Amino acid sequence: MHLYRTHTCGQLRASDTGSKVRLSGWVHRKRDHGGLIFIDLRDHYGLTQLVVSPSTPGFDLVEHVRAESVIRVDGEVVARSAETVNPNLPTGEIEVVVRQVEVLSEAAELPLPVFGEPEYPEDIRLKYRYLDLRRETLHRNIVLRSQVIQSIRRRMIDQGFLEFQTPILTASSPEGARDFLVPSRLHPTKFYALPQAPQQFKQLLMVSGFDRYFQIAPCFRDEDLRADRSLEFYQLDVEMSFVTQDDVFAAIEPVMHGVFTEFGEGKPVTPYPFPRIPYREAIAKYGSDKPDLRNPIEMQDVSEHFRGGGFGLFARILEDAKNAVWAIPGPKGGSRAFCDRMNSWAQGEGQPGLGYIFWSDDQGGWGGPIAKNLGPEKTDGLMKALGLGQGDAAFFVAGDPKVFYKFAGAARTKVGTDLKLIDEGRFEFCWIVDFPMFEWSDEEKKYDFSHNPFSMPQGELDALLNKEPGEIVAYQYDIVCNGHELCSGAIRNHRPDVMLKAFEIAGYGPEVVEEQFGGMLNAFRHGAPPHGGLAPGIDRIVMLLAGETAIREVIAFPLNQQGQDLLMNAPSEVSEKQLKELHIRLAPPIKA
């Protein structure tokens, strides 16, 4: 017989009745029923109920053993009586009558309960993560993560992609977030950087003659944390040669659709090809470049209904040509109480308020200050244009859309959530396309790159030479699911002349480009194929599939929101000897 087990704790069935077995695992729960002790024994695979009688050798050990101690038992599989069968367990038709028991590892008093999964402070959960990971939900999430990565890898290989690894120690890059720097002992005063993404290396692989690359790549960014962002994360890094934007979409859509169908527990997934929404349309309709399409609300520009009179405040705002009035429909939100709550919410968001019109049963028509000023005829025309009628409401935001669009998008989300318009039981995908190549900086009084400086502008060099920078759009795209940006991608700028001109428009001379990106630029001078790619985030994909709201719930050993590893006590101080070897002298910040 094997030293520790003949079966796992999730394996035994009624067909095993009468078998002599050996099991090892954790004491999940212990119950004393009139002399007989019942133990739920747990391992990675499941639970098995044990029955220990006073005559069993080691019974006194079992009486005093704590939860989460590790034990080994020998015993016989017996069928449970009909009234004690547990239909919720795969092993629920049997139990093991223990003949011998040995404690392999006794547990101390637990700082964190495993059974029952009560809510517990995150700092305790992270400090004792090995206990937290024993809890069913988190354990299942980490298994799901492994399965999702296996599925992604299989689907990519089936499409002819090859998996390569790129360097972890690389050069610091000026674009994007802050780098994590690693001092070089062999080269004093110089530093490596941990990669924010394998961006330049994957492009160099295409220049090297490879055609389809992927990698489950670790990435590191020294940036502010939030629920769906971490200092270290993994992404499905992808690059392809001789492709258009459509080719990239056609390659990745079956992977995303397949993975979400496989692990989405029956929730409908957007069929591919996924909808494509131009960036400016997404901002105008949803107030966001990562819209949640489960929310049916679409905002509309209703400036013409207010221009020149009616509601004086909006009319005055519209005298400035750059301003607009946007409407946020609120189907079935037609009550003063709901409108007042929305107005209070807006004030809590730092806004002066939120204009509204609502259906008033008392008046038998539209109510609210805006309706009163517009008059019945204009108000009726406005609400009909929004597709609204009895029982509905509409909310209004006025000013410069560049300033208010994020707030308008948040109001759309708030209305959809509070009115329960969002279908939680589905995965809605879309592409956001046609991102602006450049944006004007009022602070610096110049154009700069809106997003990725290495994207190919639509129209290439001709567009850069003959269009206003603010009108140029890039072959850049994001994939969005349920309001979460899963990745960004682009068709790359593989031509040195186009790249240098793009950087020139953004205020960077050729000497700066050569200094900071000379390696890649020089490679492009030796024959570079048109290429493009993207990089969906593994953590966010698993978070959505697991139904979690924070990526820490799908990472085995995450950092907390202050960027600390409470289990391993990182970051930590290092010895003076280590600093000396690296030629580093510390200059701590002076406390005020």
UniProtKB/Swiss-Prot annotation:
Species this protein is from: Phenylobacterium zucineum (strain HLK1)
EC number(s) reported in the record: 6.1.1.23
Residues bound to ATP: R221, D222, E223, E485, G537, I538, D539, R540
Protein name, per record: Aspartate--tRNA(Asp/Asn) ligase
Stretches that traverse the bilayer: none
Example of a GO biological process term: aspartyl-tRNA aminoacylation
Record-stated family: Belongs to the class-II aminoacyl-tRNA synthetase family. Type 1 subfamily.
NCBIfam families xrefs: aspS_bact, PRK00476.1
InterPro entries, per database record: Aa-tRNA-synt_II (IPR004364), aa-tRNA-synth_II (IPR006195), aa-tRNA-synth_II/BPL/LPL (IPR045864), Asp-tRNA-ligase_1 (IPR004524), Asp-tRNA-ligase_1_N (IPR047089), Asp/Asn-tRNA-synth_IIb (IPR002312), AspRS_core (IPR047090), GAD-like_sf (IPR004115)
Positions bound to L-aspartate: E175, R221, H451, R492
Top-level EC class: ligase
One Gene Ontology MF term: aspartate-tRNA ligase activity
UniProt keyword annotation of Ligase present: yes
General function of this protein: Aspartyl-tRNA synthetase with relaxed tRNA specificity since it is able to aspartylate not only its cognate tRNA(Asp) but also tRNA(Asn). Reaction proceeds in two steps: L-aspartate is first activated by ATP to form Asp-AMP and then transferred to the acceptor end of tRNA(Asp/Asn).
Pfam families: GAD, tRNA-synt_2, tRNA_anti-codon
SUPFAM superfamilies associated with the record: Class II aaRS and biotin synthetases, GAD domain-like, Nucleic acid-binding proteins
Subunit structure: Homodimer.
Reaction(s) this enzyme catalyzes, per UniProt: tRNA(Asx) + L-aspartate + ATP = L-aspartyl-tRNA(Asx) + AMP + diphosphate
Site (Important for tRNA non-discrimination): H33
Renumbered residue ranges of the record's region Aspartate: 199-202
Localisation: Cytoplasm
Keyword terms of this UniProt record: Aminoacyl-tRNA synthetase, ATP-binding, Cytoplasm, Ligase, Nucleotide-binding, Protein biosynthesis
Gene name linked to the record: aspS
GO cellular component, one term: cytoplasm
